[in-house]
Curated annotation (Swiss-Prot):
Species this protein is from: Bordetella petrii (strain ATCC BAA-461 / DSM 12804 / CCUG 43448)
Keyword field: Amino-acid biosynthesis, Branched-chain amino acid biosynthesis, Cytoplasm, Leucine biosynthesis, Magnesium, Metal-binding, Transferase
SUPFAM superfamilies reported in the protein's UniProt record: 2-isopropylmalate synthase LeuA, allosteric (dimerisation) domain, Aldolase, post-HMGL domain-like
Cofactor(s) of this protein: Mg(2+)
Record's keyword annotation contains Amino-acid biosynthesis: yes
Residues that span the membrane, as ranges: none
Protein name stated in the entry: 2-isopropylmalate synthase
Gene: leuA
Binding site for Mg(2+): 42, 246, 248, 282
Leader sequence residues: none
Domain Pyruvate carboxyltransferase: 33-307
Known EC number: 2.3.3.13
Length: 568
């Protein structure tokens, strides 16, 4: 890179003075633009291996299913494959009556004739003619004057009218693009556009499409919006023109440029699904449409099965959609960060059906796009208690008390730090089982018998007889207390203090099980949790006590021989 890039690059300034008449910044988008997909033309021509007719047909059908009413289907004068594909659509009557196909051509008579021939017979079609108008193209590519460039556009428009007239069975419309509008002097772009409209003679009932492409994205999006608003206000036949934009993504701001352009007066947007197209791609129509959706404006396009749309695009383009791609990527609804997971978990818990969507970190409900919530929270070394507990609750119905969430997250953290990898929901459950439910040494519950009501009652004493396995040795102990758990602890004969207790049901009906969570202290040790799960709530609570005691002992808490002997 140069130490001083100003010696090689200069900023593009579309206006000699500041365009202070702008009004677009205060506007809002309250209805969708006309959408035109150019996946089968601009998207296709940018592929290493252009689509076969079979792949183009599959993509076309997907675009129709999504709801596109204008689809650019090819460049038939430049490719026999494109010509054959357009004819297949027309001859086999594959174009719905409410869909208009668009065919692109350069401004040469033989190419225009071939283009019209390709689309002739369709119920409705648009011929899209373009020629470059920017200074660099006039000087470097064509070595032509402004008048010569303008004449190319005028002549091309005249030829289009001539050849369309030979096929009255089709309802024809016309689209003109001053290519590289983004770096063309606004006054010259206006001059050429008005000259083309003078030849075409559009009316409010039969409008011409004037497309203003950011063929090369050369400025910040606000300057592109200024250019669009200036054209919008100065076109001679504005009421007879559909003002269209075609932003490319060279600077990475095509979506913003398109949104600003609509605010500035554009009626129509051309682009591709997932931003396919030359170089860095065209504007992404999926992102644009779903940005509108998240603002309460239905885009008129259906992405309720976003994964199907993505699979189709990946197959037809032979290119993957990035896992972080807005709305459609594998990871866009996934949180690894602990604080994010905690906020999402709380948001899901508070979100009411049919209420305004207010789940933190998720700008859209994944279910609206056909996504499940399974991958919303995933666990790695950056995760915290919220994500871990969410997975256990969603996948296994375990609702952990807050302090247990914190304690168990440390066990997960140890695993992720040691392995450096993500742990799945199944991994989390396996670690939970190992940490809490498989702690059977040295104490394991065999059976018990209680004299009294396990539900308890004020002032009521319970007697219990418990059979335990202590390191393979069977022992029978007895105890009493004012509740089942206190009687069980008394029978153990170990200095245990119950600090907290939680329980809940897992499942419903005949498959219901009880989950018990006990926080206790052995002697003067720190507190720790144990967990028990059983069809019987009392059995589950006893298992939870033994789970906690065994975990304490495994972590180095000692119990004297006399204390252990009391349980003999």
């Amino acid at each position: 890179m140069l130490a001083n890039p100003a010696t090689k690059y200069v900023p593009f300034a579309p206006f000699a003075r500041d365009f202070s008449e702008r009004t677009w910044p205060s506007r809002r988008i309250t209805q969708p633009p006309i959408w035109m997909s150019t996946d089968l033309r601009d998207g296709n021509q940018s592929l290493i291996e252009p689509m076969s007719v079979e792949r183009k047909l599959r993509f076309f059908e997907q675009l129709v299913k999504i709801g596109f009413k204008e689809i650019e289907v090819g460049f038939p004068s430049a490719s026999q494959t494109d010509f054959d594909f357009v004819r297949k659509l027309v001859d086999e009557k594959r174009i719905p009556d409410d869909v208009t196909i668009i065919v692109l051509t350069q401004s040469r008579e033989d190419l225009i004739s071939r283009t019209v021939e390709a689309a002739a017979g369709a119920k409705q079609a648009i011929v899209h003619l373009y020629n470059a108008c920017a200074p660099a193209f006039r000087k470097v590519v064509f070595n032509m004057s402004k008048d010569e460039i303008k004449q190319i556009a005028i002549s091309g428009t005249q030829w289009v009218k001539q050849y369309m007239a030979q096929h009255p069975e089709t309802q024809w419309r016309y689209e003109y693009s001053p290519e590289v509008f983004s770096t063309t002097e606004p006054e010259f772009a206006l001059e050429v556009s008005n000259a083309v409209a003078d030849v075409w003679q559009p009316t409010p009932e039969c409008k011409m499409v004037l497309n203003l492409p950011a063929t090369i994205e050369a400025t910040t999006p606000n300057l592109y919006a200024d250019q669009i608003e200036w054209m919008h206000k100065n076109l001679a036949r504005r009421d007879s023109i559909v003002l269209s934009v075609h932003p490319h993504n060279d600077r990475g701001t095509a979506v913003a440029a398109a949104e600003f352009a609509v605010m500035a007066g554009a009626d129509r947007i051309e682009g591709c699904l997932f931003g396919s197209g030359e170089r860095t791609g065209n504007v992404d129509l999926v992102t644009l449409a779903l940005n509108l959706y998240t603002q309460g404006v239905h885009p008129g396009l259906d992405f309720s099965d976003i994964d199907e749309v993505r699979r189709c695009a990946e197959y037809c383009n032979q290119l993957p959609v990035h896992p972080r791609h807005p709305y459609a990527g594998d990871l866009v609804f996934t949180a690894f960060s602990g604080s994010h997971q905690d906020a999402i978990k709380k948001g899901f818990a508070q979100q009411k059906p049919d209420a305004v969507w207010e789940v933190p970190y998720l700008p859209i409900d994944p279910a609206d796009l056909g996504r499940s919530y399974d991958a919303v929270i995933r666990v790695n070394s950056q995760s915290g208690k919220g994500g871990v507990s969410y997975l256990l609750e969603q996948e296994h119905g375990l609702v952990l008390p807050r302090r247990l969430q914190i304690e168990f997250s440390r066990a997960i953290q140890r695993v992720t730090d040691e392995t450096g990898r993500e742990v799945t929901a199944d991994d989390v459950h396996t670690i939970f089982n190992r940490e809490y439910l498989e702690q059977h040494s040295p104490w394991k519950l065999v059976r018990h018998r209680i004299d009294g009501d396990p539900a308890g009652g004020q002032g009521k004493q319970f007697s219990i007889q418990v059979e335990l396995d202590y390191n393979g040795e069977r022992r029978v102990v007895t105890g009493s207390g004012d509740g089942a758990i206190s009687a069980f602890v008394a029978a153990l004969g170990i200095p245990v203090r119950i600090m907290d207790y939680h329980e809940h049901a897992i499942g419903t009906g005949t498959d219901t099980r009880a989950a018990s969570y006990v926080e206790l202290r052995v002697g003067d040790s720190a507190t720790g949790f144990g967990v028990g799960i059983d069809r019987d709530i009392v059995t589950a609570s006893f298992q939870a006590v033994l789970s906690a005691v065994n975990r304490h002992l495994a972590n180095g808490v000692t119990v004297t021989e006399s204390e252990t002997a009391q349980a003999a």
